[in-house]
């Protein structure tokens, strides 16, 4: 019988995109083995302040604020008032609001970018900042300069 690590590595060999595999292996070193997996995604629960972290075997081109690829999703519990739905969507297509679950997610190319995105959403909901694409992009670019 195969151990989980062998099974996981065999699963990675079937993924179409290399970057999500590399990032998933990095997360394994940080968080340990994923809590769930399918043929095309991995999931960790309650890690690093997130409700869940999901890496998918996808590589989505995203042009804002600069061209990059998205494949990692992070979620938190947060009720976003409907009045912010459109302004947040206009700020970034990476902001994912699920009104039924009362959660908000971010899809970016790193956990750090997701944390920056979700902090932006929390600041908008708390009305500490106006929801604008310029403010969102400023935060992402500032985060990138730090790393």
Locate the predicted segments by residue.
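Short acidic, low-complexity intrinsically disordered linear motifs used
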Residues: 1-10
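Short, aromatic-enriched amphipathic alpha-helices that serve as compact interaction elements
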Residues: 11-15
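A cross-family detector of function-defining hotspots
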Residues: 16-147
């Amino acid at each position: 019988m195969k151990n989980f690590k062998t099974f996981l590595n065999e699963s990675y060999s079937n993924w179409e995109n290399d970057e999500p595999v590399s990032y998933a292996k990095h997360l394994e070193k940080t968080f340990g083995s994923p809590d769930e997996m399918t043929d095309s995604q991995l999931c960790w629960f309650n890690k690093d302040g997130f409700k869940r972290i999901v890496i998918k075997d996808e590589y989505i081109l995203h042009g804002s604020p600069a061209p990059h690829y998205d494949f990692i999703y992070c979620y938190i519990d947060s009720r976003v008032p409907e009045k912010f739905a459109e302004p947040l969507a206009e700020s970034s297509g990476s902001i994912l609001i699920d009104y039924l679950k009362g959660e908000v997610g971010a899809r970016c190319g790193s956990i750090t970018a997701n944390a920056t995105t979700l902090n932006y959403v929390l600041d908008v909901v708390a009305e500490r900042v106006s929801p604008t694409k310029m403010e969102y992009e400023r935060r992402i670019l500032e985060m990138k300069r730090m790393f």
